[in-house]
């Protein structure tokens, strides 16, 4: 049994028990809250980092079907327009450019830089007109002072050669070749053979003439829509052209038929007065 409390003095022991427990619990809660507050930014950061890739994956899963459906929708629209007489193309606009032979030679020379070095040097020298004139004069002088050279016209028994382009007296014979390049034809040769054409490694480069002839050939083609490289053009059906041709032929026949009946009428008008005259002469002869 506890001793009785003194009069006038309140009992402190029972009151201190709950307060001490409450204070102890409060300190524990404060420590837990502090730890939780310290851990909050880390937890939020990890949660944010974990959610971002998930959102990106969802966006990718959404965008891929959207683009796929848009492509199928475009193909469907093109097929519908084609049935209605339109034509959808994705060809880029081709500009017609007149290529000069010099540009063709340069293109082929760049494609085959190591094919013939001497030919390239001659090409660069002959581009200048002054150098070409001097070279022609030098060739003419050498042909005059060397009577035994095959290029001199007075040399007896000189073999017939096609003539190099540098000789002034030679006839202007063009060397026909599919490859556009500088030809090294000249000297004593039996046939008009180019040294560069004889190489098997020489690939014939055909200049690509991209023009709009295929577009112009189609009559009645009108561009309805043009967005970048995508074009929608209206093309007339062949039946319409055939109907127009048939109408033109019918109108031509009607014009001819309109002129034809005019001639029999004139002939009847000419023959009508002639018949009574003949009958009258026959009656007179019979009466006589």
From Swiss-Prot:
It holds the Pfam family RELT. Belongs to the RELT family. Residues 152-172 have a biased composition (Low complexity). Residues 145-172, 237-288 are annotated as: Disordered. This is RELT-like protein 1. The chain crosses the membrane at residues 58-78. It comes from Gallus gallus (Chicken). Residues 237-246 have a biased composition (Basic and acidic residues). The lineage of its organism: Eukaryota, Metazoa, Chordata, Craniata, Vertebrata. Residues 79-288 are cytoplasmic.
């Amino acid at each position: 049994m506890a001793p009785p409390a003194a009069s006038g003095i309140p009992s402190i022991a029972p009151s201190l028990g709950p307060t001490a427990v409450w204070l102890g619990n409060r300190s524990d809660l404060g420590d837990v809250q502090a730890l939780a507050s310290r851990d909050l930014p880390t937890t939020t950061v990890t949660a944010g980092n974990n959610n971002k890739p998930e959102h990106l994956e969802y966006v990718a899963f959404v965008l891929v079907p959207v683009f796929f459906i848009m492509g199928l929708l475009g193909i469907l629209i093109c097929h519908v327009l084609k049935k209605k007489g339109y034509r959808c193309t994705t060809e880029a606009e081709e500009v017609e450019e007149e290529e000069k032979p010099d540009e063709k030679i340069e293109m082929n020379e760049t494609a085959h830089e190591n094919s013939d070095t001497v030919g390239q040097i001659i090409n660069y020298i002959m581009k200048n007109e002054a150098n070409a004139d001097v070279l022609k004069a030098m060739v003419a002088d050498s042909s005059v002072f060397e009577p035994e050279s095959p290029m001199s016209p007075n040399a007896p028994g000189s073999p017939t050669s096609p003539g190099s382009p540098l000789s002034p007296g030679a006839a202007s014979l063009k060397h026909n070749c599919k490859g556009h390049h500088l030809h090294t034809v000249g000297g004593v040769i039996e046939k008009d053979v180019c040294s560069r054409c004889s190489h098997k490694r020489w690939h014939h480069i055909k200049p690509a003439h991209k023009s709009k002839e295929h577009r112009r050939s189609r009559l009645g083609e009108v561009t309805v829509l043009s967005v970048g490289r995508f074009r929608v053009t209206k093309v007339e059906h062949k039946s319409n052209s055939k109907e127009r041709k048939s109408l033109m032929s019918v109108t031509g026949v009607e014009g001819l038929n309109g002129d034809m009946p005019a001639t029999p009428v004139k002939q009847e008008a000419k023959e009508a007065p002639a018949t009574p005259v003949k009958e009258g002469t026959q009656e007179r002869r019979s009466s006589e």
